[in-house]
Amino acid sequence: DSIFPNNWISFHENGFVFLYPMFAENRRQERKTSVVDVIKNKFIVTEIKDFSIAENENIFLEGTGSMVLDRENKIAYACISPRTNERLLNDFCNIAGYTAVSFTATDENDVLIYHTNVMMCVADKYAVVCLSSIIDEKEKNKLISSLQKSGKEIIEISFAQLQQFAGNMLQVKTTEDELLLVMSTQAYNSLNTIQRETLEQFNRIIHSPLHTIETAGGGSARCMMAEVFLEKRKD
């Protein structure tokens, strides 16, 4: 799981770096100051917000696994679970200037989905989401309304596609300012032709086989990236 840095750290445009409380005790050692020091050498960090003390209360918020962030519109989407505490979610939103849109999501066997980034992805002009996982109609409609109001085209995925990590994608930007959508080959292969064509209207798709990681670690492409939005140092 140490190849999933997005669960313990996130970087923000205003210079904030957040450190997060982790559910699994063996993963708490991943929060390394050496990583933060490397980032500080290359980027401007104004403040470090350390939420990890919440582990003493046995409450958790596992970074951008727990929260899918619409950074442009400052919205934090989160499915509440033992790894995603609503109080900590609201604390994050108050500090970072986000609005929380929270809900409960379950898989097809009615088991809680503990990481939001498994069932949805928010990009610049679209969102990939498994709406079937949200049982409560009010919560589902609130999510749909929020996405539509922020100008996102909703691309719906099924439970079967969710199981193949089709929700675990991340839109990134190259040094040439080209937008790309990154996912695993398993996720890509699960998409139907219409879904692929719709996504490719917005950006190219990049995929790579991650089967061993997906099988052993339970995460996929998005989990392996902790995107840096900090301003680069000029010196």
Language-model features and meaning:
Residues 1-235:
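The feature marks the mature, well-folded catalytic cores of soluble enzymes
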